[in-house]
């Protein structure tokens, strides 16, 4: 999932990254998810639908369903992490007509993700994601994904370096 502050999806975090994975023998899929004016949970549902599609077509595409790993950059990291922490939410499976296990990622690589909606938030990303709901403190807190981690969250490699200006 490329980043872009939920306003766009970055080209530099899409095909160049996928090509590196392909060169190493991995499958790679780029999700160009919906951004502003789209609102939560549309992008999350699109990512969940993509994971379910890959699981459904695993034999056809020669995918090891034990190794479906999400990678997301910046706001795309928030999106990937969202599926990682929310995959068991019933609204996802019900909306897509699948089981929760079909949308569960096996792991995540979160690359300088937008994670917190608290003190150190990249507020622009959350304003674009939530729209008018940004003013609802409970909805902002729900999107502060460091508060949503549970025993059901897949294993995660998370990395940051310098400030990400989105």
Where in this protein do the model-derived segments appear?
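Alpha/beta-hydrolase active-site loop signature
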Residues: 5, 35, 115
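Catalytic nucleophile-loop/oxyanion-hole region of alpha/beta-hydrolase
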Residues: 9-11, 16, 29-65
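A fold-wide structural signal in alpha/beta-hydrolase
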Residues: 22-32, 69, 107
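Active-site nucleophile elbow and catalytic-triad environment of alpha/beta-hydrolase enzymes
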Residues: 94-98, 132-154
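Acidic catalytic loop of the alpha/beta-hydrolase fold
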Residues: 116-117, 163-166
């Amino acid at each position: 999932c490329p980043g872009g502050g939920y306003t766009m999806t970055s080209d530099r975090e899409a095909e160049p990254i996928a090509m590196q994975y392909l060169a190493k023998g991995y499958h790679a899929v780029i999700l160009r998810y919906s951004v502003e004016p789209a609102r939560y949970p549309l992008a999350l549902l699109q990512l969940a639908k993509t994971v379910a599609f890959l699981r459904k077509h695993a034999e056809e595409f020669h995918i090891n369903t034990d190794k479906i790993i999400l990678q997301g950059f910046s706001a795309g990291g928030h999106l990937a992490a969202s599926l990682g922490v929310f995959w068991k939410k019933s609204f996802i499976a019900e909306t897509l007509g699948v089981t929760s296990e079909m949308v569960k990622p096996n792991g995540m690589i979160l690359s300088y993700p937008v994670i917190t909606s608290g003190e150190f938030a990249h507020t622009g990303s959350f304003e674009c994601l939530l729209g008018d709901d940004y003013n609802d403190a409970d909805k902002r807190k729900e999107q502060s994904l460091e508060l949503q981690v549970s025993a059901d969250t897949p294993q995660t490699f998370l990395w940051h370096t310098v400030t990400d200006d989105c």
